[in-house]
Amino acid sequence: MAAIYDALFIFMPIVVLIGLIIVWSYFSPKRVVIYEYERGVVFHNGKFHRILVPGAYWLLQRFDTLQRVDVRARFITIPGQEVLTADNINVKVSIAASFQVNDPLKALTITSNYSESLYMILQLGLRDLFSSSPVEELLAKRGELSKRLFETTVEKVSNIGLTLPIALLSPRT
């Protein structure tokens, strides 16, 4: 009987230690670093929890999911779009735009890919702008077209969490 107690004294701490290691690995926190040029969006069990600003954080890896969002200014170009004017004349135009993520939560949750959404918003804004005017009017107000495109798309872009500081049109031959 004494041999059984001796075995328990030897193996019981090992079993407890193994159990603690298993529990610790299940609930262990994970250290993450958010850099100056990004923001982190934390979802706890699939629901929005908080936005992380630059710094170091501890997250529970079993319950928390981190999505990183780059908030640096980026550029997008839409080359050579052929657009019909109101008088059915084809015009080839390119767009160059600068954008930046303003609201990381909106950028992640409202659309599946905010870059593609921006591309589509600019493309549709361009088509709306050109299809509503005849070619003579477009040529007469050439300098104003970029401003009008910017005005028509800026609100739609802000709805998906982006800011659009610049949207420029350039005619193509």
Question: What are the language-model segments listed below?
Answer:
Residues 1-173:
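N-terminal hydrophobic membrane-entry segments
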